[in-house]
Curated annotation (Swiss-Prot):
The keyword ATP-binding does not apply. One of its GO terms (biological process) is sporulation resulting in formation of a cellular spore. Pfam families: GerPE (PF10970). Required for the formation of functionally normal spores. Could be involved in the establishment of normal spore coat structure and/or permeability, which allows the access of germinants to their receptor. InterPro entries: Spore_germ_GerPE (IPR024496). Transmembrane segments: none annotated. Keywords: Germination, Sporulation. This is Probable spore germination protein GerPE. Disulfide bonds: none annotated. Induction: Expression is sigma K-dependent and negatively regulated by GerE.
Amino acid sequence: MLKRISRIRLVKFNSLGIASVFQVGDTNEIDMSVKVFAVQRSLSTFYHNEGSFNKKEYQIFQQQAVKPLPETGVQSAFCHEVPAIYVRSIKIQGVSASSVLHAGSASLIRGDARLKHIRQIQSPRSQSPAKNI
């Protein structure tokens, strides 16, 4: 692994999400994993049978992650005349689920995000108040 100094004058970001990494400098391995199940409703209601989660109903949480094949036969050579990484500024809106913002060298980076987002939106007619006749 390359060994260098990372110097950043300014880092500005609004959000660092679940299982995300902000790393300055060299690292051997970064491994991020997150599983998210979210329900969004237009009306705030809660039914008595909610709150339990059955992973068997959602195969996305049970499937094995697809991993890339390992590098084979790739040879490379680097010559760093200045052994430092200089960055004036980094401005990021957000680093999302299982992502990385990294300034430096890394031997291995893995990220796995599984999201199931259910939106229950009612039609505009059903949201309007009932008219009494």
